[in-house]
Amino acid sequence: MDIWKIIYTTESGYEDEIKVSAINKFMAWDIFEDIVKDFDEKVISADCFRVVDS
């Protein structure tokens, strides 16, 4: 499994990032969708990147 970093912005302008462990980008998005269900605000944008160890 890889580590995926998702950077997101809410409708009030709050920006943050979370890291999830997933097999691929599609699974990472699915995990993120489950997490944002508990947010008080709507997420208006998000980007997903695979974390690479150097």
Sequence positions of predicted segments:
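Intrinsically disordered, low-complexity regions of eukaryotic proteins
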Residues: W4, E17-K19, K42-V43, F49
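Short aromatic-glycine-(Arg/Gly/Cys) micro-motifs in beta-strand/loop hairpins
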Residues: M1-D16
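A structural detector for beta-sheet-dominated domains
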Residues: T9, S21-I23, V52
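Short, mixed-charge low-complexity intrinsically disordered segments
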Residues: E33-S54
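Short, surface-exposed linear segments at secondary-structure transitions and domain or protein termini
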Residues: K25-D34
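A short, exposed loop/beta-hairpin motif centered on an aromatic-Gly-Thr core
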Residues: Y14-K25
